[in-house]
Amino acid sequence: MNVSANDLAGLKVMVIDDSKTIRRTAETLLKKEGCEVLTAVDGFEALAKISDQKPAIIFVDIMMPRLDGYQTCALIKNNPQFRATPVIMLSSKDGLFDKARGRIVGAEQYLTKPFTRDELLGAIHRHVSTVSNH
């Protein structure tokens, strides 16, 4: 996939994961592409930041304490202001059940961890319509 260096410049991307390693990996990859990266360790922290920062796309881990990825996604999708914001589920399991459950709560896509740079950027290009002209 040939992605020009700055077509993602300034795009706000949120990564919600209780793993510091995953947050850091995603943040490093995305910042290289010029994205503005917001991170949160769980759904509660994320929801406060989402209403404040209004990211263009949200990556959320499924397995998190307090509020898991499914609950977080459902809360985002139940808010009329953020219903159209694409949510990509992240999971270390590649199960059909998890993918189906992700679709039920309104997730746009499901990525298996560890994800690659191309998978991460591919998801953004697939779901953020303003990427090439924002």
Predicted features and spans:
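Short hydrophobic/Thr-rich beta-strand motif most characteristic of the beta2 strand and flanking loop
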Residues: 34-41, 49
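Receiver (REC) domain active-site loop signature in two-component systems and cognate sites
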Residues: 64
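Charged docking surfaces used in two-component/phosphorelay signaling
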Residues: 24-32
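Active-site beta3 strand of CheY-like receiver
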Residues: 53-59
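Non-catalytic signal-transmission and effector/linker regions of two-component phosphorelay proteins
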Residues: 1-12, 118-134
